[in-house]
Amino acid sequence: MSNQYQEEGCSERPECKSKSPTLLSSYCIDSILGRRSPCKMRLLGAAQSLPAPLASRADQEKAMQGSPKSSSAPFEAELHLPPKLRRLYGPGGGRLLQGAAAAAAAAAAAAAAATATGTAGPRGEVPPPPPPAARPGERQDSAGAVAAAAAAAAWDTLKISQAPQVSISRSKSYRENGAPFVPPPPALDELSGPGGVAHPEERLSAASGPGSAPAAGGGTGAEDDEEELLEDEEDEEEEEELLEDDDEELLEDDARALLKEPRRCSVATTGTVAAAAAAAAAAVATEGGELSPKEELLLHPEDAEGKDGEDSVCLSAGSDSEEGLLKRKQRRYRTTFTSYQLEELERAFQKTHYPDVFTREELAMRLDLTEARVQVWFQNRRAKWRKREKAGAQTHPPGLPFPGPLSATHPLSPYLDASPFPPHHPALDSAWTAAAAAAAAAFPSLPPPPGSASLPPSGAPLGLSTFLGAAVFRHPAFISPAFGRLFSTMAPLTSASTAAALLRQPTPAVEGAVASGALADPATAAADRRASSIAALRLKAKEHAAQLTQLNILPGTSTGKEVC
């Protein structure tokens, strides 16, 4: 594991990235040919021994194969593999026919020898000049770097064939970046050539045979290869766990992508970590005899990708549908109220249109309902009441008075004497009449009219201040806990004291009317008295504001105000 992490760390360090792609490509070639990586060779102090194995391998394979350049062309034309399979099915992987592997190795060795002597590359390219001087941190000498650069040019055709697919989900794109698409096994059988192994089992046995260890090792011992394979498998298991975490925790995808970005870049650039992990999974499978699910995912990721992509899409689409089904199942049916419940609720609505939470809870306990249902009933009841109000305002033209208990003979009766209550609200009507009578009694100089409303005598001149004093101060904006301070600041209005007396006096005058209404509980009598008087004032003020707006006396913005 330590060597594996040293390789990745070296490929991720900025000085390694800033050198050039030649070192990275040499890293690819050395790993594909089965030798130790340049980082390990530098750590072991054997950086100067690179050209000797290259030359020895070149001589051996020239003796075996003849002309190396003639064999490199068909190999390049045949082998279009992603980086993950280059070690499985590439040269030295033991998965192709031994002749094909030797031909591939001969092609790479010939490229290295040609660049070492200064000739052109495999595709007729002029190799780049070697680096000037090797620093102590260099992974190999200049001749090795130039050889690797020219040999990497032979693999450019492989890189062209790896266009990224269009990903459906982010988790699928992560898996595609980490483990590229693997062609199905029949296509791999065709790649092995006319004399290739026919079945995957035979190919596995050929890979685990005694002759595959030197081919995969490429000059190193079989024990070193076993250690490398075990380390690679552990590293790949960690990557698989990270991928599973990505699939399970989609909310953390962005953060995980940022954390994995340099690591994924190094894997995509070198192409050896994934390839070594795939080879490790194959080797463990040949030793153990059967594949674990994670290793099957490594060898056949196209099946897993198809399933994973479909599952992720179905889950993302199905989660919404499942939530929708749950919501549909949990849909609340309409509450059916009994006649007793409706009677009690209507009685409470007569007392106040806006009951507080304590009143609602008490009603809910008495009527065997929930507080939420009581609140919704009051909302609906208020909406119905507003609708009736609008319908009543449209049926009466603005100049004619509303039908009410008070006399309509006075000119201001449409504004002060109108009663918004339907006939089944006697308690509130009587409360408002009693309040008006009490306010009139507070001013003996102003004799009350026959309807006992607080109005100046008909012979007195009706100024605008008198009208506004009666109407504006009964608007909902002025019915607030601070109305006493407000009245004290508005002395120029002649009827301000009249309105203040009207708002101060109703509680003692209303006691008889409210007590006569069907209230059996004496504990809530005071609260109900206050609620009924405030409700009466609110309703009267709302209707006065509507009337004044129709006559363009007050601005239109004050029509829809309600005090909650």
Swiss-Prot record:
Keywords: Developmental protein, Differentiation, DNA-binding, Homeobox, Neurogenesis, Nucleus, Transcription, Transcription regulation. One of its GO terms (biological process) is cerebral cortex tangential migration. Its main location: nucleus. Residues 159-171 have a biased composition (Polar residues). This is Homeobox protein ARX. It comes from Mus musculus (Mouse). Disruption phenotype: Hemizygous knockout males were born at 19.5 dpc and died within a half day. Neonatal males have small brains, small olfactory bulbs, small testes, hypoplasia of the seminal vesicle and abnormally enlarged seminiferous tubules. Abnormal morphology in each of the developing brain regions in which ARX is normally expressed. Suppressed proliferation and nearly normal migration of neuroepithelial cells in the neocortex. Aberrant formation of many nerve fiber tracts at 19.5 dpc. Abnormal primary migration of GABAergic interneurons from the ganglionic eminence. It is found in: Nucleus.
